[in-house]
């Protein structure tokens, strides 16, 4: 049984994002899960896992409460290669959504609470010298997922996520390590027809809004919980959590909407100064795209910065300061903040 709980101010979303106002504290984020393991299922070379979970997360664009169960079988094909097959069922409830005004009526009615039933599979090759703080090796992985109404999901989509990381000691400089990585995510929702019941204007008798006749519309959107987001301590560090994007995925007030595609590129030079202290310089680039057809390297946004690592018994304690290299102005006239500070445990990638 594993749990995770975070403590923060009990304020509205703006105070969470910008650290303003309020003095009350509350447990606003938590995750509780329990896992049952069955080695060598039915005498095979596959190991089985069944996990139940409940989680509440606070994101810049919405709050997410999710609960569900996941059944997984994994196989160690070689010492470096692992494969897995999964079936997942869950209920996602999104609240406190910050949406584009034109999207609010549609998204609020279709996806306030959505049931997902998915099949997924993955293949990973890992040759890192140390999974916590690698100095040599590579990681390559491909994940694919499908949700469909025929298997009990309320929405359908297909999604894939690919990533590759490489780590090398600089020849002739054993205290220097170069790390680089690339991530690509693509998702395509299945179009379906749904009936909406819009509210008609106030009637002549002054009885208020009345439900008009249903209209049928074609829907091809992903729920908020299934969209890609980026920005933060493990993606592009010049941006705060989920704040990477442009006009298509960040609204007029700076709130992230997520997208159907993502590109992330990272490069980092790690220098060991003492037995417990490392200094790091990094360059990150990427973007979140509203549609797969919108993916373009010309729309990549970037950030650079530096950081400090303290080698603790639980892993590197990390402090990074990222700078945006292409600040933009929101439609409301506000300019993006120039920097983002991140404090975490473990390497960024």
Where in the sequence are the language-model features?
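Short, loop-centered acidic/histidine patches that primarily coordinate divalent metals
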Residues: 282-286, 309-313, 320-324, 348
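Gram-negative/organellar outer-membrane beta-barrel architecture
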Residues: 1-132, 138-141, 237, 244-249, ...
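C-terminal outer-membrane beta-barrel translocator/porin domains of Gram-negative envelope proteins
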Residues: 86-271, 276, 281-285, 289-291, ...
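Strand-loop-strand
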Residues: 291, 296-312
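Short hydrophobic "helix-edge" motifs at membrane interfaces and signal-peptide entry regions
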Residues: 33, 273-275, 303-304
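Secondary-structure transition/capping motifs at alpha-helix termini
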Residues: 1, 40-45, 75-81, 164, ...
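Glycine-centered small-residue hotspots that permit tight backbone geometry or close packing
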Residues: 232, 238, 303-307, 315
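Outer membrane pore-forming secretion/assembly proteins and partners of Gram-negative envelopes
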Residues: 27-31, 258, 305
């Amino acid at each position: 049984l594993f749990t995770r709980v975070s403590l923060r101010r009990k304020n509205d979303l703006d105070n969470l994002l910008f650290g303003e106002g309020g003095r009350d504290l509350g447990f606003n984020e938590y995750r509780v899960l329990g896992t049952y393991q069955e080695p060598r299922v039915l005498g095979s070379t596959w190991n089985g896992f069944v996990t139940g979970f409940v989680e509440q997360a606070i994101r810049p664009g919405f709050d997410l409460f999710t609960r569900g169960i996941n059944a997984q079988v994994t196989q160690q094909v070689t010492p470096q290669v692992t494969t897995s097959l999964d079936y997942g069922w869950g209920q996602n409830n999104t609240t406190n959504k910050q949406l584009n005004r034109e999207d609010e009526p549609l998204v609020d009615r279709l996806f306030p609470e959505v049931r997902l039933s998915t099949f997924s599979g993955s293949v990973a090759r890992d040759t890192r010298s140390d999974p916590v703080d690698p100095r040599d090796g590579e990681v390559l992985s491909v994940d694919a997922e499908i949700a469909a109404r025929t298997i009990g999901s309320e929405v359908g989509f297909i999604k894939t996520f690919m990533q590759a990381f490489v780590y090398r000691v600089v020849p002739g400089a054993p205290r220097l390590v170069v790390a680089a990585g690339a991530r690509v995510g693509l998702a395509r929702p299945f179009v379906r027809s749904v009936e909406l019941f819009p509210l008609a204007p106030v009637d002549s008798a002054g009885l208020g809004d009345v439900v008009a006749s249903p209209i049928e519309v074609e829907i091809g959107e992903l729920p908020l919980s299934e969209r890609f987001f980026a920005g933060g301590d493990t993606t592009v560090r010049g941006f705060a959590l989920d704040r990477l994007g442009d006009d298509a995925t960040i609204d007029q007030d700076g709130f992230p909407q997520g997208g159907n595609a993502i590109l992330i590129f990272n490069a980092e030079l790690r220098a060991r100064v003492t037995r417990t202290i490392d200094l790091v310089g990094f360059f990150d680039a990427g973007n979140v795209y509203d549609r797969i057809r919108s993916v373009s390297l010309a729309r990549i946004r970037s950030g650079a910065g530096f950081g400090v690592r303290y080698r603790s018994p639980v892993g590197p304690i990390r402090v990074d300061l990222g700078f945006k290299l292409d600040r933009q102005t929101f439609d409301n006239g506000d300019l993006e903040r120039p920097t983002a500070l991140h404090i975490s445990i473990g390497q960024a990638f």
